Amino acid sequence: MDAIAARALSVVRACVTVTDARVSLDPGVMETLGIAINRYNGLTNHSVSMRPQTQAERNEMFFMCTDMVLAALNVQIGNVSPDYDQALATVGALATTEIPYNVQAMNDIVRITGQMQTFGPSKVQTGPYAGAVEVQQSGRYYVPQGRTRGGYINSNIAEVCMDAGAAGQVNALLAPRRGDAVMIYFVWRPLRIFCDPQGASLESAPGTFVTVDGVNVAAGDVVAWNTIAPVNVGNPGARRSILQFEVLWYTSLDRSLDTVPELAPTLTRCYAYVSPTWHALRAVIFQQMNMQPINPPIFPPTERNEIVAYLLVASLADVYAALRPDFRMNGVVAPVGQINRALVLAAYH
């Protein structure tokens, strides 16, 4: 599967470079396209040219790239255009070992496959407390029972209210609400001024402290916490106090936009509005794979096939922009006038 995806990616990327007839082609591009086009034409009865000049020739090359991407993804999109019929025999061209793949394409595919077969710490995009079901007002003292109470202020901040002389452990409060956190990087600070339940202003007692695994950590210092070592708080003073914990970032074994290099810009390219035709074609491809058709996913992709699909479709978007094909998609009406922000916004809604 890696070889087929790498060949498809190599061919699609090579097609981006052939639009200017005055430019000498890279020898690697000539070799890749020469063999790939010959195999593709022979198996599908198409007539793709290596140096497309006319609109019909540009269309044919783009259709070949679309066939390559669909074959590599093992997707059939059916009858979606009166001008394009998917050539199912394309997989036979990609399966031949004669078509070379370039180093970068194979490295990209192997990196995706390798990363998705294992786990490693990566920075999480959402806050650690995004899953909290309730929050409280910052700086409002509230201890309905006991001597300490912790609560969440927002997705990144937690606060601990403490009576005079109180102490306790806050591991359960500081740990993220979901996922397998590896390390959490936070700072803590006492709230200098806060208010009691009646609204009167109070000042935190001096000498409040936080220890991690028995070691005192200074307020304002960045603490790297493994979510296991005990985090204890104390208020040895004679007044009530509130401590605030702010998580700067944390790492997890969950997939993120850093799991694979260039994943974030790849997603941006995939979902960019190039034209109504491209918008519809991309949506059809992703729908067949049970992926988000119009807007990027809420959470980073977690499967190899999804990330490979994003990489191939993003490259297909580049080919679309380079070749400027002109064909129709069923149910798509060409806009009147130039594409503007209002038209694009309406397409995403």
Swiss-Prot record:
Pfam families documented for this protein: Orbi_VP7
Glycan-linked positions: N45
Domain of life: Viruses
A GO BP entry: fusion of virus membrane with host plasma membrane
GO function term, MF aspect, one: structural molecule activity
Gene Ontology CC annotations of this record: viral envelope; viral outer capsid
Keyword terms: Capsid protein, Glycoprotein, Outer capsid protein, Virion
Subcellular location: Virion
Coiled coil: none
SUPFAM superfamilies: A virus capsid protein alpha-helical domain, Viral protein domain
Record bears the keyword Glycoprotein: yes
Family the entry assigns: Belongs to the orbivirus VP7 family.
Function: Major structural core protein; binds to structural protein VP3. Constitutes the surface of the AHSV core.
Subunit structure: Homotrimer.
Name the UniProt record assigns to this protein: Core protein VP7
Organism: African horse sickness virus 9
Gene name linked to the record: Segment-7
